[in-house]
Regions:
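Short beta-strand scaffold segments in enzyme catalytic cores
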Residues: 49, 97-101, 108, 228-232
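Conserved beta-alpha-beta core of the PfkB/ribokinase-like small-molecule kinase fold
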Residues: 134-208, 226-229
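Conserved phosphate-binding/catalytic region of the ribokinase-like
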Residues: 1-7, 32, 156, 206-254
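A glycine-rich helix N-cap at a beta->alpha junction
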Residues: 76-93
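Conserved phosphate-binding/catalytic loop of the ribokinase/pfkB sugar-kinase fold
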Residues: 85, 89, 100-144
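Hydrophobic beta-strand scaffold residues
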Residues: 58, 84, 164-165, 220
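Glycine-rich phosphate/adenosyl-contacting loop at the front of the ribokinase-like
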Residues: 1-63, 68-79, 247-248
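Structural alpha-helical scaffold elements that stabilize or flank donor/cofactor-binding regions
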Residues: 127-128, 180-183, 213
Length: 254
């Protein structure tokens, strides 16, 4: 029996969220927030945390700095029973941090990558990652040192019998290159949102994007916001509407 249900390698940071900022934010003015939250951030860490909370055995490899941000983030994962025993520490870079500014409309999301950008294949214990049924990767484009090696990593894990899922998240450079098309050929489950699906397939038509991507992976799940989600597998498509809720805070909702 594998040691874990799911292993992951990815970024770890905290989110600093400022609420209630004015809708207009002129420069060089001292603007007041009505509230503040410091929470576990990063797509990879949030996914690991939530999978463990739902009962999955999760092993997570990440990289932190020698700072309180890294210690706090790791403690949040340990509190959810995520195994972080293979975490490495950067001697020179700090743990990353994301600042979210909410001010009545679309949020501003500002990220300092820190040591998440330097994690490479050399920092990963492959035997540890192989000790699972499934491997998940998030935030493809944030892993700057790992990006040229992701296809190699996927091949190594697939050869050990693991299935692979990928949630690309956004590309800050908005180029959507960096070997992503090669990596997609090695993915079993792809989970983009609508914009990401269009970028990955080179079209502005979401239905065309879904059709194109569904031929490349065993299971495609497109997150469609208020419209719910669409899943395609084996040529069959199922769309599920979103549950009607009062939006309190979308941070970390995927």
């Amino acid at each position: 029996m594998p040691q874990f249900d799911i292993t992951m390698a990815g970024e770890l940071n905290l989110d600093l969220i400022l609420y209630g900022l004015p809708q207009e934010m002129p420069p060089e003015r001292e603007l007041l927030a009505s509230n503040l939250a410091i929470t576990l951030g990063s797509s990879s860490a949030i996914t690991a945390h939530n999978l463990a909370t739902f009962g999955s055995r999760v092993g997570f490899i990440t990289r932190v700095g020698r700072d309180s941000l890294g210690h706090t983030a790791l403690d949040r994962l340990r509190g959810a029973s995520v195994d972080v025993s293979r975490t490495s520490q950067s001697p020179s870079l700090d743990t990353g941090l994301t600042v979210l500014l909410t001010h009545g409309g679309p949020r501003h999301i500002l990220t300092y990558p820190g040591c998440m950008a330097e994690m490479s294949l050399a920092h990963l214990d492959l035997d540890y990652l192989k000790s699972a049924r499934h491997f998940h990767l998030s935030s493809y484009f944030l892993h700057r040192a790992l990006v040229p090696q992701i296809a190699e990593l996927f091949r190594e894990l697939r050869s050990a019998g693991l299935t692979i899922s990928l949630d690309t998240n956004d590309d800050p450079a908005d180029l959507w290159q960096d070997g992503i098309q090669e990596a997609l050929e090695l993915v079993d489950v792809l989970m983009p949102n609508e914009r990401e699906a269009c970028k990955l397939s080179g079209t502005e038509d979401i239905e065309a994007a879904i059709e194109a991507l569904s031929t490349r992976v065993s299971l495609l799940v497109v997150k469609r916001g208020a419209k719910g989600a669409t899943a395609v597998a084996g040529g069959k498509s199922v769309s599920v509407p979103a549950i009607s809720v009062e939006i309190v805070d979308p941070v970390g909702a995927g």
